[in-house]
């Protein structure tokens, strides 16, 4: 089977507070053989912009991310597990974690909530049956999925995604300085490939995740704008791109650990665009 070929028997497992322990036990087994983890999150948009003076546009972009991640709560996390060949485990390949979120009490951008509601996210169920992030963090820390150099993380334009995960795992606000953020990032996620960053070296590939998937002739499983389906599509895109553009080998020195839109590798930093993360927050569209 070619890498990342769609197999419709693959299932996305919905995880709520009631089945979290059971599903994390399965993940602790799966990660032993399927050490590529494609990840996506859903979060409630962008609600704030930093004020004051900034050393550079790069500094502004990170402060924009930081102030929004600090203020807001994650809604969903999708994790898809694959092996070196891009193959899935038998049965469930993707776990979609649904976190506690209250539309009455928690902050959000209205347009983001409308998009997620249209996409099938059940906010009433998130309020009543959602996972507590602190307990999830305890389970994730001992799962073998984070803090492990043998695990390779796959993502798409993922500054916000990793920002929310670091906030959960440290149970604290993000560090004030971007360099400190990347130090923590490397601790929890030693190997990261951001598909959007890889696209810089892929002739004619452009756009958001859905557009890229269509260019690569990949077929989505599950609903768009939900973290499980998006993580699965991200993993499929990585392996298809690795085969088509990188001769099945990614140069770690050039690509590992770079997040598109953050740090010195950011095209936004270089061209001075001020709304990098507004775009990222709407990257699902």
Curated annotation (Swiss-Prot):
Signal peptide: none annotated. Keywords: Cytoplasm, Exonuclease, Hydrolase, Magnesium, Metal-binding, Nuclease, Nucleus, Repressor, RNA-binding, RNA-mediated gene silencing, Transcription, Transcription regulation, Translation regulation. Changing residue 149 to K: Abolishes interaction with CNOT1. It is found in: Nucleus; Cytoplasm, P-body; Cytoplasm, Cytoplasmic ribonucleoprotein granule. Changing residue 230 to N: Abolishes RNA deadenylase activity. SUPFAM superfamilies: Ribonuclease H-like. Its cofactor is Mn(2+); Mg(2+); Co(2+). It holds the Pfam family CAF1. Binds 2 divalent metal cations per subunit with RNAase activity being higher in presence of Mn(2+) than of Mg(2+) or Co(2+). One of its GO terms (cellular component) is cytosol. GO terms for biological process: deadenylation-dependent decapping of nuclear-transcribed mRNA; defense response to virus; miRNA-mediated gene silencing by mRNA destabilization; negative regulation of cell population proliferation; negative regulation of DNA-templated transcription; negative regulation of gene expression; negative regulation of type I interferon-mediated signaling pathway; nuclear-transcribed mRNA catabolic process, deadenylation-dependent decay. Gene3D superfamilies: Ribonuclease H-like superfamily/Ribonuclease H. Changing residue 141 to R: Abolishes interaction with CNOT1. A divalent metal cation 1 binds at residues 40, 161, 278. Its EC number is 3.1.13.4. A divalent metal cation 2 binds at residues 40, 42, 230. One of its GO terms (molecular function) is piRNA binding. It catalyses: Exonucleolytic cleavage of poly(A) to 5'-AMP. The keyword Magnesium applies. Has 3'-5' poly(A) exoribonuclease activity for synthetic poly(A) RNA substrate. Its function seems to be partially redundant with that of CNOT8. Catalytic component of the CCR4-NOT complex which is one of the major cellular mRNA deadenylases and is linked to various cellular processes including bulk mRNA degradation, miRNA-mediated repression, translational repression during translational initiation and general transcription regulation. During miRNA-mediated repression the complex also seems to act as translational repressor during translational initiation. Component of the CCR4-NOT complex; distinct complexes seem to exist that differ in the participation of probably mutually exclusive catalytic subunits; the complex contains two deadenylase subunits, CNOT6 or CNOT6L, and CNOT7 or CNOT8. In the complex, interacts directly with CNOT1. Interacts with AGO2. Interacts with TOB1; recruited by TOB1 to a ternary complex with CPEB3 which is required for mRNA deadenylation and decay. Interacts with BTG1. Interacts with BTG2. Interacts with NANOS2. Belongs to the CAF1 family. This is CCR4-NOT transcription complex subunit 7. The lineage of its organism: Eukaryota, Metazoa, Chordata, Craniata, Vertebrata.
């Amino acid at each position: 089977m070619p890498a990342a070929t769609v197999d419709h028997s693959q299932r996305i497992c919905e995880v709520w507070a009631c089945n979290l322990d059971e599903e994390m036990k399965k993940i602790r087994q799966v990660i032993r053989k399927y050490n590529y983890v494609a990840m996506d999150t859903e979060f409630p948009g962008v609600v704030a912009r930093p004020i004051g003076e900034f050393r550079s546009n790069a500094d502004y972009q990170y402060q924009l991310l930081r102030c929004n991640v600090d203020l807001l709560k994650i809604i969903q996390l999708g994790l898809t597990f694959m092996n070196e060949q891009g193959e899935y485990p038998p049965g469930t390949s993707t776990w979609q974690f649904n976190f506690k979120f209250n539309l009455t009490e928690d902050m959000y951008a209205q347009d983001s909530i409308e998009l997620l509601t249209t996409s099938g996210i059940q906010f009433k169920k998130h309020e009543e049956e959602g996972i507590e992030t602190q307990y999830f963090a305890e389970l994730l820390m001992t799962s073998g999925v984070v803090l492990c150099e043998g695990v390779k993380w796959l993502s798409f334009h993922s500054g916000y995604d990793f920002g929310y995960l670091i906030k959960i795992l440290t149970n604290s606000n993000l560090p004030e300085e971007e360099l400190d953020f990347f130090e923590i990032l490397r601790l929890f996620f030693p190997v990261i490939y951001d598909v959007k960053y890889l696209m810089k070296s892929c002739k004619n590939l452009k756009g958001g995740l859905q557009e890229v998937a269509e260019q690569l002739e990949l077929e989505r499983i599950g609903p768009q704008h939900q973290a499980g389906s998006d993580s699965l599509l991200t993993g499929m895109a990585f392996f298809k791109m690795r085969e088509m553009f990188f001769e099945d080998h990614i140069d770690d020195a050039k690509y590992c650990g770079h997040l598109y839109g953050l740090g010195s590798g950011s095209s936004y930093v270089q061209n001075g665009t001020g709304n990098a993360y507004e775009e990222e927050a709407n990257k699902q569209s």
